[in-house]
Every structure is written in structure tokens, then in C-alpha cells.
Amino acid sequence: MNIQDYNKLIEQAFQNKRNKAVALVINSPGGSPVQSEFLADKIINLSKEKNIPVITFVEDVAASGGYWLACAADEIFASKASIIGSIGVISAGFGFDKALNKIGVDRRIYTAGKNKSLLDPFSPENKDDVKRLKNLQTKLHDHFISFITLRRGKKIDLKNKDLFTGMFWSGQEALELGLIDGIGQVNSILKDRFGNNVKIKEFQNKKRFFDLGNLISITFEVISNKIEEKLIFKKFGL
């Protein structure tokens, strides 16, 4: 998910000042923290500007960047079986240096700037590189925690030591921890809140393809993103 794909849709959702609320339906195991922040900030700012409340409804999962985005809302609802949380930062990769040695291949790197080859997967792991990455992760994690604490406030159970460790919970457990506000689905909650005659207008992202080059480029990007997304969903057993 990124701001370019959803920027116009978000603006359209807030255009009608007569709207009683904007419902944000999320099914995401995470992604870029930067894009999650961009999207969340966009929603929060428009909500304040238009004075329209936002309600998040979680489907299968709202984890990591998905939960960051969920917290852009004033309220969060989920199913009892939804997966919620994973408030943490992760970096993953592979080390291929031993494989290269086995097949007799030399790795040659030429850089201007001593840190340009930081964390190169074809070179032996460097303790200073790992330390640098860990420091960066800690700063990102602290920023993530600050945002969640700001948005959820006194609702969350800060006494729970696992809250910000990257742990994830079922919807029912998340409710008890204050990570969400209730159990329920979008249609039933909105009808209870605004009456049986409530009208729901959906805004969905649809990519357009203009030429073969663009089609091929976007197709490969979509396939790559789908594979990565599927692997992350597998982490949560979905």
C-alpha cells in the first residue's frame, strides 16, 4: 500500500460534508512504515479539516503497518478472530557469502563512501553494520510506539510488557488490551450507529494501464508485491 494509490480515494471519501463518517476497511499484514504514516496522516488531517469521524474495520489482519493505518481512525472494530498488533520493526535478508565460496566466485565491490556497501548480502556479516541497523530499527520502533500511544491514549494497557514487542493477538485479546474498541463488522456497526437506512458508498483502488510498457512494468511490480504480501500473511497463518 502506498499514498499514490490511495491519495485520491481518500480525498473523495471526505468530499461530501454531509457524510456522517468515513469507514476504513483494512486487511493488511503491514508494509512500508513511511507509506503507512503518509496514509494515516492524510486520513487524520482530512478528518480534522472536514470534521468527519473515521471508523476502522479490520478483516483478517491489521498488523505492523496495517495496525499503524488502523490507528488513524477514532475507533477500531474487528472480528474476534482477526489478527491485531505486531507493533515492531523487522528487517530480513540472506547471507550468500558462504555459497559463493563453495562455487568459487569472488565478490568484488567498488564504492565511494565506506558505508555504501552496508549489509551487502554477498559479504560476511559485519558487527558494526548490524549495530547501525539495530539503532535505525530502534528509532523507527520508538516512532511507531509514540504514534500508537498518541492515538490510543489511555485505552491501551501499558502494563502489558508484550504490547510493543511485535507480538500479535486475536481480536478478542486485542479488545482486552485496548488495541481495538469493539467486536463487529462494518455493515452491522454502521446500521446500529446510523440506522437501518444508512447508505454506504465504496471507494476502491483500480489500477489503469495505458501502454504495453507500463502494463509489463506494473504487472511485474504487482506480482512481486503479491508474493511478498502472501508471505507476510503466512506469518499470521492466513
Residue ranges of predicted features:
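N-terminal organellar transit peptides
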Residues: 1-79, 90-238
